[in-house]
Amino acid sequence: MSISPLKCPCLLQRSRGKIEANRQKALARRAEKLLAEQHQKPAQSKQGPSQNLPRDPSKSGSHGIFFKQQNPSSSSHGDQRPQNPHSFSPNTSEQAKGMWQRPEEMPTACPSYRPPNQVTVAGISPPLANSPPGVPSQQLWGCELGQGHPQASLETQSTPFANTTHEPLAKVKNFQETAASSCGQPPRDPELEARMARPSTSGQNISGSVMPRTEGRLQQKAGTPLHRVVGSQQGRCIRNGERFQVKIGYNEALIAVFKSLPSRSYDPATKTWNFSMTDYGPLMKAAQRLPGITLQPLEGAEGHMESPSTSSGIIAKTGLPAAPSLAFVKGQCVLISRARFEADISYSEDLIALFKQMDSRKYDVKTRKWSFLLEEYSKLMERVRGLPQVQLDPLPKTLTLFRAQLQKTSLSPVADIPEADLSRVDSKLVSSLLPFQRAGVNFAIAQRGRLLLADDMGLGKTIQAICIAAYYRKEWPLLVVVPSSVRFTWEQAFCRWLPSLNPLDINVVVTGKDRLTDGLVNIVSFDLLSKLEKQLKPPFKVVIIDESHFLKNIKTARCRAAMPLLKVAKRVILLSGTPAMSRPAELYTQILAVRPTFFPQFHAFGLRYCGAKRQPWGWDYSGSSNLGELKLLLEEAVMLRRLKGDVLSQLPAKQARWWWSPQARSTPGPEPPWMPPPRMTTKDKTKQQQKEALILFFNRTAEAKIPSIIEYILDLLESGREKFLVFAHHKVVLDAITKELERKRVQHIRIDGSTSSADRETSASSFSCPRALRGVLSITAANMGLTFSSADLVVFGELFWNPGVLMQAEDRVHRIGQLSSVSIHYLVARGTADDYLWPLIQEKIKVLGEAGLSETNFSEMTEATDYFSKDSKQQKIYNLFQKSFEEDGNDMELLEAAESFDPGSQDTGDKLDESTLTGSPVKKKRFEFFDNWDSFTSPL
C-alpha cells in the first residue's frame, strides 16, 4: 500500500524544503549574473529629484515593496529598452543584502535625505537580497515608481511577504512620503495616479509587469528618448499669409510644444493649430527632437529657421522650443507712387539706422513705414544685403524695368504723350473725336497698339478702338471679337466712321459654317470664336476684343481660344468698362494678353497682388494685396481708364445710340412671320383692314425681338451694370424680361399699366436706394411723374411711333439731380416694323426741332443715316405707317391692340386671316382703355 505524498505530513514538509532550497539557489545564481553584468557597465549618474514620481501603494493596489515574480520565458517578451541610467543598482552582494535590511544606507534619488529612524520590515529574510534579475534597477524605497515599479498580485500571497504586518507597511509609506517631500516634489495628483494605475498595452516594463500609459508620455515630455517608437506620425506646415498652419494627427508631446509657443492659436472648426512665422524655426527644431514626428517644412521658409547657436542650448536643457529670436526681420519693397517706394518691414535697430542714412527718407507716422525715392532704390538694396538678420524683398522685376520711366513721367499717364500723326485715318473719324478720346488714341499708339482701354461706359470706347485699328490699317485683316448681341452694331460703326472702307469688306460671322477670314474686317462672337479655332491660322496681326472681361476665367473655352491668338498678335486692343468685377485675379488674363512677359506665371502675380493663401486644398487667390502698386503698373504700361466724372465737361448731357438686333438676319428660309404682310400694300383692301394688318405686323415684331432684347440685357448684367432702366411697350415683352431676371435672381422693379399708384411710388423710392437694382417699365405707363436719376443708362427694347413719349421716358433719368451723362440705347431690328418706325420717329423729331419745340436730333446723335433703302414696296409701307399714325384716334387703337395681344392665340407662322380684319374693336372696351390711358397721361 503506497502513501500519497500529499496526504503524508512528513513528505509534504520535506518537499517544501527542497522546493524552497532550489528556489533560493536559482535566485542566488541570477543575482550573481546580474552583479557580473553591472561590473561590466560604466558607472551611471544618479537620477535627479524632478524625475521621481511618488505613488501611494494603497491606490495602486500593491503592498509596499511586493512584486510579482515572472517566468523567465515570459520576461523575454517584455520591453527591450535599456535600463534607466539614473536608477540605483547594487554593485556588491553586501550592498544587495543591506538594501533590504538597512534602508537608511540605500542610495536614493535624494542623497541629502537621512531617515530619522532605522526601519526594518518584519518577514523579509536575507535571501531576498538576491532579488530576481528582472528588477535590479528599481528603487523599491525611492521615488522612481514611474520607471517600472513592480506591481503586486494575488500570486504573492504564498510567499513569506504575506506575513508582513500592517505596521511596518505604514512606516514604509510614511518613509516614502517624507522622502518625496524632502526632494521638493509637488503634491500628488490623484487623477494622474489613477491614470498611472491603469494597465497599458503599449509596452511592458523590464520586469515583465505592465507599464502605465502615462509613463511613456512623461518620458517624452522630459526629453528622454525612447529606444523603440510604436508607430510614427507625419504632417506638414501650410503657409497662410503671415502665419502658418500645422496639419498632423494628435500627439500629446507635440501639443505640449504647441502650447509653449507665444503665437499659438487653435481653430476648433478645423481642429488645427496655427502660429506666427516668428515661431516657425523653434517649432521645427522642437519637432525634430520628438521621436516618431515628421513635419514637412514650408517652401522657401529657410529664413525663418533659427541658427543652432541661439536655440540648441535651450532645447537641450528643457526639451522644449526656445523663445523666437527677435533679431531676424523680413519685409518687402512696395511702390507707392510714380517716384517713391516704401519698405514694409518690421522693426530692426540696424535697419532703422540704415534708413536714416538715405537722403530721400520720409517716415509716415500713421503707417509707421519709411519711404524713399526710386533713384535711391539700388543704393538701399545693396546696403540691406549687408545686414545678416534682415531680409528685404525687392520690387518685382517688372517694376524695375519701368523705374527710369516712372521717375521722369508726371502724375498723369497721358499728359506727356506726344500727339500721334493721324493723317492716314479718315478725316471724318478724326474730327469726331473728343479731346479725351484723342488722348486715348495717342496713348494706345505710344504703347505700340497694345493696351486695355477701360473707359467708363458711354465714353466712346468703340470709336477710339476703330481709330486705333485704322492707324495700323496696313497690317489688316482685322479681327473683332464681341458679344453676339452687338455684332451688327460694330458693322454699322465701321461703315459710319470709315467711309473709305467698302461695306463688302466687312464680314460678320453668324454661324459656325461661315469663314472667319473672308473679309478685311471680320466680326465674330466669343462663342463662335471657340468653334472656329482652326481658322485662326495664320494669326491676325490686329485684334479688337470688346468686353474683354469675358476672358477673366482662364478655364473657359472662349478664353482658351482667344489667349493664343492675343499672345502672337502684333496689336491687341482690349475694351472693357469693368475689367475686374470683384478681385484682382480677374485682371490677370487681360494683363497677360497685353503684356505676356510681365507675369508669365499666375502664381507670382497671385502672391504679389491677390493675397495668395495656401489652404489644404491648394492656393486661394481670392484676396487682394499691394493694390496701389498694381494700379501704378497698369496705368504705366497696360491700361487707360477715365471715368465720367473726369471728363464730364466734355460730354453732352444725353447721348442716344441705336443697337442692331440680328434676329431678322439669323432666320433661314422664306420671309419670316414678322415681315410685313403682302396685303398691307394691296389697294383693294379697306383702310380699316390695312390698319389691322399694320397692328398685327407691329405685334409680331415685338415677339420676334424678345430673344435679342434678353441677350442684350444679359450682356449688360455680365458687364457689371448695377442700375439701368429697360422700356418696352408690349406686355409679352415685359413678361419675358421679368421672367429672365427672376430666373437669374436679379433684383428689379416693374411698372406697367396694371400697377397701382401706391405701388408706383414705392417702386420708384426703392429704386433710388444704393443697392443694385434694375427697372422694367412700360413706355406708356411709366413715362411721366417718376424719377430714376440714380441710373444713367436707359435701354429701349421697342420703338414707339410717338417721339414725344420716348423723350418723356428718357427724361425719367435725365432730371435735376443727375450728376452724370445719360446714355440712351435703342434696340432696332432690321427686317421688322423698326425699319419703318425709326425713320418715322426721326422725321417727326426733325420737324419739331425746326419749329424750336425739341432739343433732340436723332439724325445727329445716332447712326441712323440711310437706315434702309426705300424701294417701292417699302416706301408704300412707310407711307402707310406715316398716314395711319397721323390720324386722330389711331394711337389709341394701336395701344389697345398691343395691350390685348396674346402671342399664344395666333401662330406667327399662319397666314393672315381676312375674317379677322373686318370688325372693329368694341367701343365699350375702347372707352375703358381711354379712361385707363387718361389716368397715366394726366399730369400729377
From Swiss-Prot:
Pro residues: compositionally biased ranges: 669-679
UniProt motif (Nuclear localization signal) ranges: 641-658
For the ligand (ATP), the binding residues are: 455-462
- Looking at the record, which segments are called Disordered? 1-155, 662-682, 899-918
One MF term from GO for this chain? ATP binding
Where does the record place the modification N-acetylserine? Answer: 2
Q: Where is this region: Mediates interaction with RPA2?
A: 2-36, 11-36
Q: Which residues lie in Polar residues bias regions?
A: 41-53, 68-95
Q: What is this protein called?
A: SWI/SNF-related matrix-associated actin-dependent regulator of chromatin subfamily A-like protein 1
| Protein species of origin | Bos taurus
Q: What is the lineage of its organism?
A: Eukaryota, Metazoa, Chordata, Craniata, Vertebrata
